[in-house]
A protein has these predicted regions:
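Membrane-interface helix-loop junctions and terminal tails of multi-pass membrane proteins
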Residues: 1-236
Length: 236
């Protein structure tokens, strides 16, 4: 069962029978973390060093990757298996921006979901690091991440992608349709944002501000797109 909340009932809690912490069911938090773990491991994957070249040419992705029919299938199955989990940051941000922005419980619930996505991604990265030998974060980014800078076209792309993805997500009520939308617009919606955050936090947080700002601002732009789509739909 793939649960999609409409803007009118976006703050309705998922009844899974666990204890409440910060307005969010503990089982729901574990569900979100487990889903993020599975998707990070099986879909986002891990870049391993093959010893056939330098750190750029001699690497191999150990995972499905965010492209193709297998990625769509994996995400679709994940949303059905982990019913109620958002799994990806853009989905959570769309629910935030189309819900009641004055509802503190909703903010706590969605904030906890974002945190659990990072925790789940971090656990998957730890496991994969033990399973495979590969380049370190320092090898991949020897000079660190570039400072984040506002770009109007990037923001506009995120808003447009968010509007389209929310229409797909809220109107089709179908995990496969949402998965197709995410894969088609993965770069614009920041689908791998939680894993990027997890990787940065596990590597001394040297690039905290660039990665954090990109994670937040991409999410906000996607959420604004979802809000825009909702307002347009309400006034047609």
């Amino acid at each position: 069962i793939f649960i999609i909340y409409s803007p009118d009932n976006a703050k309705a809690p998922t009844k899974v029978g666990g204890k409440k912490i910060m307005g969010m069911d503990t089982k729901d938090m574990m569900n979100e973390m487990g889903a993020a773990f599975a998707v990070t491991w099986l879909v986002f994957g891990y870049t391993a060093y093959t010893m056939d070249g330098d750190v750029v040419t001699g690497t191999e992705l150990m995972g499905i990757g965010m492209s193709g029919i297998m990625a769509v299938a994996a995400l679709g199955v994940a949303w059905m298996a982990f019913a109620g989990a958002h799994i990806l940051p853009p989905v959570t941000w769309m629910h935030i921006m189309t819900g009641d922005l004055g509802d503190t419980d909703a903010w706590a619930t969605n904030g906890a979901k974002l945190a659990m996505q990072v925790v789940g991604g971090a656990l998957a990265l730890i496991m994969m690091a033990e399973m495979y030998d590969g380049p370190s974060y320092a090898d991949a980014w020897p000079n660190g991440q570039e400072d984040w800078a506002f770009d109007a076209m990037t923001m506009a792309g995120g808003i447009a992608a968010g509007a389209i993805l929310w229409c797909i997500h809220s109107k089709t009520d179908n995990a496969w349709a949402t998965a197709i939308g995410v894969i088609a617009m993965g770069t614009y919606v920041g689908a791998e944002g939680s894993t990027d955050m997890a990787s940065m936090l596990m590597n001394d947080m040297d690039d905290l501000m660039p990665v954090l700002l990109d994670w937040v601002m991409t999410g906000v732009s996607v959420g604004l797109g979802a809000l825009l789509a909702t307002k347009i739909d309400e006034n047609l």
